Amino acid sequence: MASPAFAVNGMFTPVKLSGSFTASMPVDSKPAASATGVRMVVDPLQRKYQSIGKIGVDYSRPKKLATYVRSGYSVGMEFPNTPSMAGHYSLTDCDKAGGAAKILMKYDEYCAKGMLQVGKRAACRTGVYTTKCTEGTQPQMAFDVRVFNRTQAFRQAQKPVAARLREQYEARKACFVLAHNCSREEAQFKEMPMSCATFLASKMEATGACYRTVRPTSVAEDYMAGSVRAQLYTKLNPKGVYGVGACEDGHAKGDADQRRVIALASEYRAAAQSPSTVTGQQYKSAQLATQLFAHDCHHEQEQIYEYPAVAAAMCRY
C-alpha cells in the first residue's frame, strides 16, 4: 500500500522512508525554510579585495537609517594652541550650543587654523626658521614657547566677559578695515570671532609688523616707540597689576626671565636679516598702522612713515 486511504493531500507532511523493508515515499519538491534566514554568501576573493566596512555585514537584515553611531562629541572644539583662538565661545552661561551653532563653531575653528597656517607659511617660506621666528631660534626653545602659548590661551579664556567682548569688537573693526570693502569678507568676520583674531595675528606674523623685528634707527624713534608700548601696557593694566591672561612675560616662576631673554634675542637677531627684509617689514608696519590708526590724519601719517618702529609698536596685537 503506497499511502493511507484516508490521507488528504496537505493534511500531513510526507516523510521520506528508505530501507530494506519499506519503499521510497514521494518527497515534496518545495525546500523547507531556514529558521535563521537567508544570508548572502561572499566569495573569498571578493572578501579579500572589498572594503573593510563591508566585511561581516548581515545582508539579510534591512538597512536602517542613522545606524552609524560615533562615540564622542562630533563637532566639539579642540583646545586652542594660540591665545587668538581662545575665549570666543564661552561668553554665556549656557555651555550647550545648538546643532547649527556647533557646526558653525567648528567651521570657524577650521578657518582660523587655515589662516594661521597661511601666516606661518608666509613667515617661513622655505620651511626653515628664520631670525624673526616667534617659536624660537635655539634648540628646545620652540617647545617652551608652545607650552607658554597654550597656557596663555587657557588664561585668555578666563578673562572677564567685558574684556573679551571689547577685544572681539576691536578685532572685528580692524578686520573690517583690512577687508577693503569686500562684503564676503565682512560677513565672515562678523560671524566668526575666532577667525577675526587669528587673521590679525597671522597677518602681523607674516608681514613682520612687530616691534621685536622692526628696530628703531634713532634715539627719537626709540623713545616714541617705547612711549607707545607704555600706553598699550597702561591700557591693558590700568591699575598697574597684571590680571589673568594680561601678562605676556609669564605666569609661573622663571617664565618672565625666560621670556625677556627670548625677546632680547629676537631683537638682536632681527639685525641679522637682509636689508630687503628689513625694508619690507618697515613698509608693511607703516602701511598697517596707516590703515588702522592714522584716521586720515596727514601729521600722523608722516610720523608713521618716518618712524617705522612706532608703527610696529602700534600694530602689536
Swiss-Prot record:
The entry's keywords: Antenna complex, Bile pigment, Chloroplast, Chromophore, Electron transport, Membrane, Photosynthesis, Phycobilisome, Plastid, Thylakoid, Transit peptide, Transport
Keyword Chloroplast assigned: yes
Localization: Plastid, Chloroplast thylakoid membrane
Modification after translation (UniProt): Contains four covalently linked bilin chromophores.
Coiled coil start-end: none
GO cellular component, one term: phycobilisome
Binding site for phycourobilin 1: C94
Record: residues binding phycourobilin 2: C133
Binding site for (2R,3E)-phycoerythrobilin: C210
Binding residues annotated for phycourobilin 3, in chain numbering: C297
GO biological process: photosynthesis
Main location: plastid
Membrane topology: Peripheral membrane protein
Quaternary structure note: Heteromer of 1 alpha, 1 beta and 2 gamma chains.
Functional note: Critical for the incorporation of phycoerythrin in the phycobilisome complex.
Protein name: R-phycoerythrin gamma chain, chloroplastic
UniProt organism field: Aglaothamnion neglectum (Red alga)
